[in-house]
Amino acid sequence: MRIVFLFSAWLLSFGALAAPGDVATLDRGTWPEQLTSPTLFDVASRAEILMFARVLLASESLDEVSLARRLGLRTINLDAVNSLRERMWQRLLTNYNFAQQSCDQDASFCFLVEDLPTLREQAAKFQVSDDSFYIKWSEPSRLFHAQYLDEQLRKAALFPQTSSEVDRFGDYERNGDEMHDRLFLLTFDSAANAIPDNTGWVAEYLRKSNINGTFFVLGKDVQARLADGSVASLQAMYSQQCLGVQGWEFRSHSHWQDWQDSVKRSAELVKSKLPENYVPLFRPPDGQRRSDAQGFFESQGLQVALWDIDPQDGAGKLKGSQSAQRVLTLMLLWRHGVINFNVKQDAVKTSMPWLIGQTAQSGIGWEDCQVAFR
């Protein structure tokens, strides 16, 4: 009875957590352990999976009108919302099964989960006792996952009228779903931006760390850099890194009449000037692209490169430390995927090094950008 009462009370509080548009972040200092081994990564991963599952389960109690109000929308695409929930449950089950493989080394947050019904059962019962070693983490984590779930459900509720990375239009679009457990790909948007010019610093940091990433560039930015410098200087800056395109300029490619020309011009420019770095990937600005574009992209030999983990480090959003802690929490939750940093903002110069340092002993890996999406 106590568990039922606690869960019911928590359901009532679900609707009064965060205003629509709030960006989720979590102070990782509330978690009492450093991720200094693969086992400790798994402990933290199990905790975040169970907390998110608890929040996800609670959201299913809201009817369509209540959910729309919760998300700050007049109408929602409930089919897209339910499809996202279903994909999330399957991913959570898979991830928990990976995370519980180390339960013989540390049994924290280890429960009997054999299938989706038992995961939902454990999510409904999940709570952290007041005398727990992890109590300081519990409520901040719950708030984080409630806000993060709102972000994702809102994108699904607007899909496909407003396209985003929340779902794919076909197999020609790729994200990190097919990546192996504990494997992540670093990607960077606006990666030829001139002011501020963080690209060279980021690329050099990656080289010194023996890591690479995929830098997505605008055609007009590459053209401007070539006007101010040489091809050789660009080749040196992007050495050992991969280059995809975001189109000629940063604008929605879903309703722009010249979107095809934007993609073709930028891809041809990068491929001709930086062939060793070029990878045939188009990242739609803000994830916005057309639903009927498969024929075009296949004719160009391009794939659409989406992402799974958004640092929310764009203009006016999270600062570097907040962004990094958000990313780490989502890495623990999803256990693999594509991370999407914004090189146009200075936050990346603090968030990325912190993230790489925090995970150095955790047993994760960074995907080779030349192998990703192949």
For the regions a language model picked out, list residue spans one by one.
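Short, composition-biased local secondary-structure segments
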Residues: 160-177, 253-271, 324-327
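Metal-dependent polysaccharide deacetylase catalytic core of the NodB/CE4 family, i.e.
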Residues: 116, 120-124, 128, 132-137, ...
